[in-house]
Amino acid sequence: MSQSANDPQFILIAPPTSNRVAFFQQALARLQLSPARVISYLDLLAGRITLPQIMDSNSLLRLESPGKDFAHEQALLELGAQVEEVENYARISVDEVRQLSFEKGRLLWPRQWYLGFRAALRLIEGQLLDCAKGEVMNTPRDIAVMFDKPRCHELLRDHHIRVPRSLGTIRSFEELETQMHDHHCSRVFVKLAHGSSASGVVAYQTNGRQHQATTTVEMMRHNGEWRLYNSRRLRVYRDQHEIAALINELCRHRVHVEQWLPKAGLDGKTFDLRVVVIGGKAYHVVARLSPSPITNLHLLNKRREVEAIQQRMSNAAWQTSMQTCERVMRLFPGSFYAGIDLLITADYQQHAVLEVNAFGDLLPGVWWQGQDSYTAEIKAMLARTSRCSLLARI
């Protein structure tokens, strides 16, 4: 298909080698659209390029995850070291950040990383104010909220979206035990406040005598201190002292703690749903089945089409659950898409929102009306921006 001067130019802010960039470029190619221009966060942070220099009326800006790239992680940690932290969470200096070397799976000061990422988002937001034209798929402000689990949870709760009960601010294992006792809660999820992809997630349960923590986190001692590493292999800790050490270390970087709600079962496993909402409508839905409490697909859990689940639920219950996901996105008016983690209760009749994922739309091999999520987003974005003649051509 020949290109027109008025055709859209997608601009991606992302690590250039990200698989997300590759998948998005493939979707554009399938639609016979021009490849996206890729700008790294590193170039923006260094001032080598600015958005007003490159955006015009045909520009469609998409922010992608800066994750899985050590240079980006290091840059955001360095930026976070320069942000004032009033809550006294763990941090390291700019010089210490520069001395870091890559260690596969290591959790590196996630609170400080978030402060840096939020500062980068604010830089982008400021540059967008100086852009006279162009569209943004998801605004930096919305992304910052989605990446702050306590703040996002509070937003949903305040707008009457059902979420698991929060146990409030926790700064230590001792505080966790006290809060669980006071809330009459024997099972909780402890999550890094700014983690993603099950990073730093602990499913903890106790009856007061016995303790069990299921987690993706491996603990290792180094020079008298704990280092935490993410792993695809789930670990189960039963020693209270080990669990206390794990929780205390996570608390140094800010955590979100919520009640562990029972999930529905299917094929001898429990599951939750990942729902991709695009332009206000629930599109792609996939069930994530796991024998453990943690269902993330990258942990080699099984995915399942949702027809069997729809058959178990009443039509009204299914429609209501999808409508809830669409309601969630109305709380993020600057966001065109997101991935929502949805719990279905054991009786298949109720649901609760577990998380809102700014970059939760990557679901390779999951289709909606013959389209993957990126293709659906591109076509829906073109429709929203009134490029109907282009849609007719593709």
Residues of each region from the PLM?
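C-terminal active-site "lid" helix and adjoining low-complexity regulatory extension at the edge
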Residues: 297-337, 344-394
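Protein kinase-like catalytic core scaffold
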Residues: 188, 256, 283-284, 352-354
